[in-house]
Amino acid sequence: MADCSDCPATSLKVFGQPLIVRNIQTAKEFLDIDKVVVPKESTNAVKLIEENFPYIDVEQFSSSNNNNNNDSRTITTTAFHNYLLNSNEVRTLNKKAEFEVPVNTFIHYSLERAALLIDAVIYPWDFLKLIQKVLCDNIKDTIISPNASIAKSSIIEGPCIIEDGVTIDDFCKIKGPTYIGKGSFIGMSSLIRNCMLGEKTRIGFNCEIARSYFAGHDKMAHQNVILDSVIGKGVWLGGYSGTANVLLNNQNIRYELNGQLVDTGINHFGAVIGNNCSVGASVIILPGRQVPSNSIIQAGTIFGKKKVIS
């Protein structure tokens, strides 16, 4: 995945934090860090690091010529395969000059394996898998903000984090592990299962959302079904729309990438909807489809191999 100013490390959020910020915060719990070196293309990453870690120096390098030699405790964002570091290896790293990770990566600690895990985020389904893992690993109890409003008729089942300003209407069911970001609204009779919903996500009446990620500031009308999908920021979904997530033959879902169909390795995968898209009423998005940012899909469309967008 190429480095860019709006890469997943800066555009995606985990528990309300940009991915790159959460990565550094996690690494800092185990490593002494006083400098972070990022590719020149990742301009947003520099801004985020400076805002959140003013005491950490930030440098940039040309990704075509990465020769950083210094004596500081450094995170250098380069590229390699996924791996884990056990406690002994973490102690060893603290004595080294540099610690290199891909810019589009996810760093998290596994209590079960007693290791710092570093997973590259290459494909959308990689991110969905990691979101499910981080929900399970990080949400062990239900934490509800005193500033949240939950109807007495609604059910919170399993561990959930419900942030400030969240409103959950009557007869809803929230099944954990689930995270609901600040200022979000869940409409009457909706079912939310194993999801991460960014801030100011608005879910309408009688919707089902399962194993999905919403970037935030998204709005859904009534009776929608979103399954195993990644929804970008500022998306509008009209009523009676949804993402199909399984093929009738139950084979692995294939995803179009650069004109080629890539086997996802999984048989449950919905759609990837880019930022600021508008999806009309009664639209069905077939499994493994990508809706580019700023697209408009007219009402009644079946969004499949022959894409119909404006």
Give the predicted meaning of each segment:
Residues 9, 157, 175, 192, ...:
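A structural connector/turn signal
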Residues 143, 159-161, 179, 196, ...:
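Residue-level "contact hotspot" at macromolecular interaction interfaces
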